[in-house]
């Protein structure tokens, strides 16, 4: 059974703090192993990637077969049903339209001193997207990672997707095609991250790596950060639902289970001022678990990390939600807009009972790659901005240099950086000669 907390009871603060501090991710000490894999790929290139793929994925490859050929992609895509294709195309269209609105504008102006200032935006040159592999891989994640990159203008876009035993989800290849991916490599794990970061004889290095993965992939992304950019280190999925009133307990139960079924370490929390609703939702969850296909996973998540929290009112519920800073936040209340205005920390907010989190996973439009483990306090979900760089611009006229140059010279002297000051003074002296 999940924890059942009540803000009015003694000991709540200690219990809630313990809930926030629960270690949900099984993160074995893989760093040494990952360091060895990365070093091996850097030293031996394709040979290391091929050997590691045979060992971990039971798949024999050659340099020529590291990437799917066009013929292989076409053959796999041909097996996708018309219904699945239409659903994926709708998702791609909506994700593309949403992210197109995120594109920022360049700026240029002249300030009071006469200096021309501004900034311009430009895409990174290349990106590598990691997609967990096998039949359980998620084509929606391909769309959510690749489409923002394409909208941003990234020139070269590749996917690394392990294919254990040679098995690939055709929908992943279709998603890659719809998103405009240039190449799909059938490799995974830390070796794929290393290949994308450092390159091999066959695989060209990229500038940024995004996408989820297991502990080995996460550790590899940490290690290559600095050589390349990364999106985030994502943990187990999580959802917090604030609910009140006449909402259907079964709907809330299904929304909680939609995250619980991802992973035994996922977390689902209901916060409500209505204790009766909270207990009804618990009963509905138990009933749904009896028939849910992934009931073993969802049941373990709900049992070990689930919680129902009864509050005095919705204002208190919002305050508790901010302390959790959930990846996904559903507001199943009479006035979700008013409650959302009280929320500061959430990866994504789903407004009203007709907006289940699952819509956001697929066809809502906003990105489903979101900050977890309370990192929504200081970070945001994946967006076009993750594939753009801002370059600042400055142009001094002689008059502007006269106006601000002496202050720059004084500051350089105060920091004992002689050449800095002299570089300004030389120009000021030339102006004074005139």
From Swiss-Prot:
| Annotated TM spans | none
Q: Which InterPro entries match?
A: Ald_DH/histidinol_DH (IPR016161), Histidinol_DH_CS (IPR001692), Histidinol_DH_monofunct (IPR022695), Hstdl_DH (IPR012131)
Question: Pathway involvement?
Answer: Amino-acid biosynthesis; L-histidine biosynthesis; L-histidine from 5-phospho-alpha-D-ribose 1-diphosphate: step 9/9
Which metal ions or organic cofactors does this protein require, according to UniProt? Zn(2+)
GO terms (molecular function) for this protein are: histidinol dehydrogenase activity; NAD binding; zinc ion binding
Q: Does the keyword Oxidoreductase apply?
A: yes
Q: What family, per the record?
A: Belongs to the histidinol dehydrogenase family.
Q: Which HAMAP family does its entry note?
A: HisD (MF_01024)
**Can you say what this protein is called?**
Histidinol dehydrogenase
Question: Which species is the source of this protein?
Answer: Cereibacter sphaeroides (strain ATCC 17023 / DSM 158 / JCM 6121 / CCUG 31486 / LMG 2827 / NBRC 12203 / NCIMB 8253 / ATH 2.4.1.) (Rhodobacter sphaeroides)
């Amino acid at each position: 059974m999940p924890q059942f907390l009540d803000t009015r009871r003694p000991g709540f603060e200690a219990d809630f703090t313990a809930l926030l501090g629960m270690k949900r991710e099984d993160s074995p000490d893989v760093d040494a192993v990952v360091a060895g894999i990365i070093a091996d790929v850097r030293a031996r290139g394709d040979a290391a990637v091929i050997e590691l793929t045979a060992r971990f994925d039971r798949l024999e490859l050659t340099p020529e077969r590291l990437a799917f050929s066009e013929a292989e992609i076409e053959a796999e895509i041909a097996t996708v049903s018309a219904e699945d294709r239409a659903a994926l195309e709708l998702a791609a269209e909506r994700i593309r339209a949403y992210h197109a609105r995120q594109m920022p504008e360049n700026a240029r102006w002249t300030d009071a001193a006469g200096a021309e200032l501004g900034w311009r935006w430009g895409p990174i040159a290349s990106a590598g997207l990691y997609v967990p592999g096998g039949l359980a891989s998620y084509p929606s994640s391909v769309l959510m990672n690749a489409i923002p990159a394409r909208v941003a203008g990234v020139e070269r876009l590749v996917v690394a997707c392990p294919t254990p035993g040679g098995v690939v989800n055709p929908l992943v290849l279709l998603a890659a095609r719809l998103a405009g991916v240039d190449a799909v490599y059938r490799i995974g794990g830390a070796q794929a991250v290393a290949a994308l970061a450092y390159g091999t004889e066959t695989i060209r290095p990229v500038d940024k790596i995004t996408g989820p993965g297991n502990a080995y992939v996460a550790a590899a992304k940490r290690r290559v950060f600095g050589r390349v950019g990364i999106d985030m280190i994502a943990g187990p999925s999580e959802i917090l639902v604030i609910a009140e009133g006449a909402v259907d307990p079964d709907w809330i139960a299904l929304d909680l289970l939609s995250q619980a079924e991802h992973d035994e370490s996922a977390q689902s929390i209901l916060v409500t001022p209505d204790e009766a609703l909270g207990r009804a939702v618990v009963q509905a969850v138990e009933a749904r678990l009896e028939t849910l296909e992934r009931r073993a996973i969802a049941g373990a998540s709900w049992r070990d990390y689930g919680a129902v929290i009864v509050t005095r009112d919705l204002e208190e519920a919002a305050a508790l939600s901010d302390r959790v800073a959930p990846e996904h936040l559903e507001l199943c209340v009479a006035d979700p807009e008013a409650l959302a205005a009280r929320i500061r920390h959430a990866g994504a907010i789903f407004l009203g009972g007709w907006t289940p989190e699952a819509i956001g996973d697929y066809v809502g439009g906003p990105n489903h790659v979101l900050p977890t483990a309370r990192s929504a306090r200081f970070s945001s979900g994946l967006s076009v901005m993750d594939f753009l760089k801002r370059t600042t611009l400055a142009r001094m006229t002689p008059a502007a240099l006269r106006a601000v140059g002496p202050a720059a010279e004084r500051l350089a002297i105060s920091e004992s950086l002689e050449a800095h000051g002299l570089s300004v003074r030389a120009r000021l002296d030339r102006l004074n000669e005139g």
